[in-house]
A protein has these predicted regions:
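Amphipathic alpha-helical interface segments
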Residues: 2-154, 182-239
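Histidine-centered, metal-coordinating catalytic motifs and their short helical/loop contexts
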Residues: 144-178
Length: 239
């Protein structure tokens, strides 16, 4: 009987792809992720701007309408949780997560690639090329450090565990069962503050990758403020 070849892990599959193709894939995903990350922040503001002083929620009559509003808010919270976790899923050959981008850039001499980008921007100025190259490298490595930090972040762990509960309609996850078997409590769902912090980190890392790998930029603060104003205008129009 012929022996069954062991299946390659996702990281092993990625490592067999030529360096040039890996970098192009990383650049493509980094570009596509920016809009998705902005939409994630948009969901956050859609929830936040519904509450507060003189908000839509404060003007709702005490009637059955409140029940519908609460359902919408719950679904937005679930969407925020699920969308956040999609960005932090494990690296996959055809994936689009942040760890996937990092894995595609591994062992590709990324700093040399970033130097070519800097050189193309300042072909006749070595000093400017060097300075800009340092800036691109700093952005990339900042993203790398934030990814390593996220790997041990208890907030992300709680959020991913809750995502598994709601996405797969589970009373408890495997993680919950393991904790209970050890006499520990299941992980609590993420708070609104946790989802907000993870969403901001997600957008920040997505921007760092996009700006370094694709030499692209956008007004970070302006984009976030625009999302806030749109949500505020939306709920205000319903009041």
């Amino acid at each position: 009987m012929a022996k069954t070849m062991p299946r390659k892990s996702e990281t092993e599959k990625i490592s067999t792809i030529p360096c040039g193709e890996r970098l192009e894939y990383a650049r493509k995903v980094a570009n596509e992720n920016i809009d998705t990350a902005l939409n994630l922040i948009g969901v956050y503001y859609a929830r936040r701007e519904a509450f507060g002083q003189n908000s839509f929620a404060s003007k709702l009559p005490r009637s059955r309408a409140v029940g519908t509003f609460n359902i919408i808010m719950q679904r937005l919270a679930h969407a925020q949780c699920i969308e956040t976790c999609r960005f932090w899923d494990k690296a996959e050959e055809n994936g689009k997560s942040i760890p996937t981008i990092m894995e595609y850039c591994r062992n590709t001499d990324i700093e040399a690639r970033l130097f070519l980008i800097a050189e193309s921007c300042y072909p006749d100025d070595n000093d400017q090329t060097r300075t800009y190259h340092e800036s691109l490298v700093q952005r990339f490595h900042t993203a790398e450090r934030l990814i390593h930090k996220s790997n041990t972040d208890e907030r992300l762990r709680r959020t991913q565990n809750f995502r598994n509960r709601i996405a797969h309609n589970l009373l408890s996850t495997r993680t919950d069962s393991r904790l209970l078997a050890k006499g520990e409590k299941p992980l609590v769902p993420p708070s609104a503050a946790t989802l907000t912090a993870l969403g901001i980190r997600t957008l920040w890392v997505s921007w760092l990758f996009h700006s370094s790998l694709n030499n692209a930029d956008f007004d970070f603060k302006h984009s976030v403020n625009l999302l806030r104003r749109r949500s505020s205008d939306f709920w205000g129009s319903l009041s």
